[in-house]
């Protein structure tokens, strides 16, 4: 069963030519056949089938069905589902079961979505390759010697490999968009606060945002409509009006659009194939009536430095709760309480997580707080002002999702700084909190996926997805 979009699936379900149970069985069979790829950490065989049967009965009895009736979805394993494992791909939470549902889970279930399982990821969402998981690597579906991107690599691979029609991920600095670019799918990070973070395990709370990975911009818009909105359990969620993103997307046309193209993004450091595909897509839009506007974001190179100071500082605070005393892994080698804390964290956390905790603790320490953390917050505000100013004159800011195509497994694990640069084009949108999307452009000369990255103004996801949809069709 190969479905191109949820719209296609919904038509067949409502017409009776397909049943939810039939669809779910097909997906579960493919998931089981691909088990060696480590895409899923937990698969909900019985739960998914029981829900599918319930939805089939609901339709047969003439009940009103939800906006996402029968949509088979995968969930990144840092989003809470009551009664299911919540591992964050870490040894320290390997056997932890959530006692509540995330707000997004409740909202999706209320509209009749079906969850197939929890996907692999970089541990605690820290990574750009899905190589930091305690459950093993995830290969790229288009070349199994290469990475799928991260940290939502399992979710991206699930959609690309046709193991789910849509997946949820989380995006802190590019963790939805970069793997989407590496896996030839759409990856949306909404405006910060557009979707409730209640039930999302925190990495960096002022950056984290739940996002959507899908085959089409239309599917991403439908899922966003359901998840968006104020939540009393998340003080950072916004009460801004939830639009009909799918309808808004359909109304966008290239005539009169102004697309900002930062010259700083197109340097000799950018892979030649990536540059060629991005520029060809922009030229196509110009030929269809859009205006390409040269803009300058002169200090973009400093975004990565500010980002890693801020997110590691927040991570060192957020991850202090995993101490072996309250829940999760506890060491068996401890002579006293202090040793239990130290050994539980040493044994339970992976190398990259420990590296970031140490960096964060350092930048928050006495004597360095003003030099690093405070200065990085000032840089963050500077970038917010810069992007606000740019988007007063253009509709979106366009560039590559990644400076290079998917790289080989193990190629960058020995050089953390090189790995961090994989997010150089996605980090600025996270720093400023604006919505951004990666849209697939096709394949390079090595038959590897390439993505285009678009940043829009606050709460303009409908327009952003409409422009992305035109590029996907280019």
Curated annotation (Swiss-Prot):
InterPro entries: Amidase, Amidase_CS, Amidase_dom, AS_sf, GatA. The active site is at 76 (charge relay system), 151 (charge relay system), 175 (acyl-ester intermediate). Gene3D superfamilies: Amidase signature (AS) domain. This is Glutamyl-tRNA(Gln) amidotransferase subunit A. Allows the formation of correctly charged Gln-tRNA(Gln) through the transamidation of misacylated Glu-tRNA(Gln) in organisms which lack glutaminyl-tRNA synthetase. The reaction takes place in the presence of glutamine and ATP through an activated gamma-phospho-Glu-tRNA(Gln). It is an enzyme of class 6 (ligase). Keywords: ATP-binding, Ligase, Nucleotide-binding, Protein biosynthesis. It catalyses: L-glutamyl-tRNA(Gln) + L-glutamine + ATP + H2O = L-glutaminyl-tRNA(Gln) + L-glutamate + ADP + phosphate + H(+). Belongs to the amidase family. GatA subfamily. GO terms for cellular component: glutamyl-tRNA(Gln) amidotransferase complex. NCBIfam families: gatA (TIGR00132). Heterotrimer of A, B and C subunits. HAMAP family: GatA. It comes from the Bacteria. GO terms for molecular function: ATP binding; glutaminyl-tRNA synthase (glutamine-hydrolyzing) activity. Its EC number is 6.3.5.7. It holds the Pfam family Amidase. The gene is gatA. Signal peptide: none annotated. GO terms for biological process: translation.
């Amino acid at each position: 069963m190969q479905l191109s979009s949820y719209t296609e699936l919904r038509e067949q379900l409502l017409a009776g030519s397909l049943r939810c149970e039939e669809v779910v069985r097909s997906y579960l069979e493919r998931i089981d056949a691909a088990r060696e790829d480590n895409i899923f950490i937990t698969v909900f065989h019985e739960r998914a089938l029981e829900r599918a049967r319930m939805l089939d009965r609901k339709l047969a009895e003439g009940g009103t069905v939800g906006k996402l009736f029968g949509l088979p979805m995968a969930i990144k394993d840092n989003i809470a589902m009551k009664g299911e494992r919540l591992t964050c791909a870490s040894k320290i939470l390997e056997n932890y079961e959530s006692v509540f549902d995330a707000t997004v889970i409740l909202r999706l279930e209320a509209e009749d979505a079906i969850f197939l399982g929890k996907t692999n990821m970089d541990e605690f969402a820290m990574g750009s390759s899905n190589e930091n998981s305690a459950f093993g690597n995830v290969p790229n579906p288009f070349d199994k010697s290469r990475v799928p991107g991260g940290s939502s690599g399992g979710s991206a691979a699930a959609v690309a490999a046709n193991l789910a029609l849509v997946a949820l991920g989380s995006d802190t600095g590019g963790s939805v968009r970069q793997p989407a670019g590496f896996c030839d799918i759409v990856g949306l990070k909404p405006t910060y606060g557009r979707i409730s973070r209640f039930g999302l395990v925190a990495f960096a709370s002022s950056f984290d945002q739940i996002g959507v990975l899908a085959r089409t911009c239309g599917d991403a818009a439908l899922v966003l409509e359901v998840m968006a909105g104020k939540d009393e359990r998340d003080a950072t969620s916004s009460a801004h009006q939830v639009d009909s993103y799918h309808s808004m997307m359909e109304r966008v046309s290239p005539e009169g659009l102004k697309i900002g193209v930062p010259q700083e993004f197109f340097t000799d450091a950018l892979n030649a194939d990536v540059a060629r595909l991005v520029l060809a897509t922009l030229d196509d839009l110009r030929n269809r009536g859009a205006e390409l506007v040269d803009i300058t974001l002169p200090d973009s190179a400093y975004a990565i430095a500010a980002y890693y100071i801020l997110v590691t500082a927040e991570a060192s605070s957020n991850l202090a709760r995993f101490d072996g005393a309250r829940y999760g892994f506890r060491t068996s080698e401890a002579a006293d309480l202090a040793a239990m804390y130290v050994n539980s964290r040493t044994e339970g956390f992976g190398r990259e997580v420990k590296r970031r905790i140490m960096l964060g603790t350092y930048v928050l320490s006495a004597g360095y707080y003003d030099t690093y953390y405070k200065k990085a917050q000032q840089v963050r505000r500077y970038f917010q002002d810069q992007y606000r100013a740019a988007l007063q004159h253009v509709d979106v800011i366009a560039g590559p999702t990644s400076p290079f195509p998917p790289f080989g497994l193990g190629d960058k694990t020995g050089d953390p700084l090189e790995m961090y640069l994989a997010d150089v084009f996605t980090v600025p949108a996270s720093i400023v909190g604006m919505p951004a999307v990666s849209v697939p452009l096709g394949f390079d000369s090595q038959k590897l996926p390439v993505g285009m990255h678009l940043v829009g103004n606050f709460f303009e996801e409908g327009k952003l997805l409409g422009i992305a949809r035109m590029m996907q069709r280019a």
